[in-house]
Amino acid sequence: MFKRTNFLYRLNSTAKVGWSSSITFATVGTALSTLVIVPGLSVLFSVLLGRDLSAPDPVRIACASALASVVLGVAAGVVARAATDRWLGVFEQVCTARRFDAAYWLGVSAMPVLLALLTGITNLGVAAAYAGFGGSFEGSLSMLVRSVTLLPLTLMAGICLGVFAA
């Protein structure tokens, strides 16, 4: 389909390796705990800590926690994959062929971006549920919408942070 030197071929190959080596979707329980339960509890604990410390707007804490988890999730995934590739000797081969291979870095980022996006949507859902149960949903709706619109920017920030940290 693609030539081996083609940008899309390299991007697709790298993304496929990331997908096949990810254990997140190994079982339903693994996917639920990795993408929903643990991140949701993290946001909930941040909100409860903010309420305990008498923070004026716990929904803002939930949105900030959700967006920060997206950036850090993507960055951690990119760094972990680059470290694995460095250990296997793949990273040296890629850097020898091209000084900066955008296809490699985008392929490496594909799986962390997907996982962080799912986690971010879940976390913002937890923030919306908290706002709804707290009775301040109308006042927090604009903040939730702004947080959703910031998701692509946080994904790009996570990619950049991961590439520069790797």
What spans do the regions from the language model cover?
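Hydrophobic transmembrane alpha-helices and immediately adjacent juxtamembrane helices
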Residues: 1-166
